[in-house]
A protein has these predicted regions:
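A SIS-like phosphosugar-recognition module
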Residues: 4, 21-270
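Single conserved hydrophobic/aromatic residue that forms the stacking wall/gate
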Residues: 1-16, 20
Length: 270
């Protein structure tokens, strides 16, 4: 008699195998960008070009923030990942030789899914006074066979391309000042043929190498985070104060002491 594994065990095994295959494919995509970064000339090297553009905007246009706007709900977490990658790596004010930097480094990176943002901060991008370069990320095709889904996807792509075009060209012909959009606002459009593990790995590695190149150009260490570590150390001391019944510490400033008093006053009594 042949003993078959329980159906649920087989499903778990198949799911684990599928996840492993996707992970391998994801790493293969990242490795392909590693090879591109290592072997391609600077003139055609995507991470180098993107880093050079960002450093140029930072130095000569006083650019202090940039946006990443994916036009795909499946990439909704991408801006948050890139926030940590960029700001934690490049938020430094001393060089590798421990000297104070003489130029601006790093930038505030932010963004959300495109269709959500069109009715919020895109007004500022088009007609505001801030200089904010934008990276659009779009997916060329969808795997869905649904006609309605494909129609919706085409509208999504149309919105993406129209926003980048409007940023570039504007609408300065309008006679009414409040309707004028000057244009000449920079953006990149990263068009991915299909969203799959390989292409996602390639996309993530692209930004990782871009950040590394920026750190080289600014001569800063992208691989430490002492500001974050300081916050962790201080939080331990604050926690002790919050949970202590002893007199308050003299090492804290008056503002923090008062905040702790207010919190303790509203804590449930043991």
């Amino acid at each position: 008699m042949i003993r078959r594994p329980p159906r649920s065990t087989h499903c778990i095994s198949s799911a684990a195998s599928d996840v492993y295959k996707r992970q391998i494919t994801f790493h293969a995509g990242a490795h392909s960008m590693d090879r591109h970064f290592q072997e391609e000339s600077a003139e055609k090297n995507m991470p180098v070009i993107m880093a050079m553009i960002t450093v140029w905007y930072n130095a000569f246009f006083n650019c202090q923030s940039s946006a990443v706007v994916p036009y795909s709900h499946r990439l909704k977490e991408l801006p948050f990942y890139l926030q940590q990658l960029s700001m934690e790596s490049l938020g430094k004010s001393v060089t590798k030789e421990n000297d104070q930097v003489s130029i601006n480094t790093g930038e505030i990176l932010w963004g959300t899914v495109g269709t959500n943002s069109q009715h919020s901060y895109f007004q500022l991008l088009h007609q505001g006074t801030q200089f904010v370069p934008v990276d659009f990320v779009a997916i060329a095709k969808t795997r869905s066979k649904s006609a309605d889904h494909n129609e919706m996807h085409n509208h999504l792509l149309a919105n993406c391309l129209s926003q980048s075009l409007a940023l570039m060209k504007g609408n300065s012909e309008s006679e009414e000042a409040q309707k004028k959009v000057t244009g000449n606002k920079p953006s990149n459009t990263l068009l991915i043929d299909e969203l799959n593990p390989f292409n996602l790995g390639c996309l993530i590695a692209l930004y990782e190498h871009k950040v590394f190149v920026q750190s080289i150009l600014w001569n800063i260490n992208a691989f430490d985070q002492w500001g974050v570590e300081l916050g962790k150390i201080i939080s331990k001391d604050i926690y002790k104060e919050l949970t202590s019944t002893d007199n308050e510490s003299n090492e804290l400033d008056s503002s923090t002491k008062n905040l702790i008093k207010l919190i303790k006053r509203n804590m449930p009594h043991k």
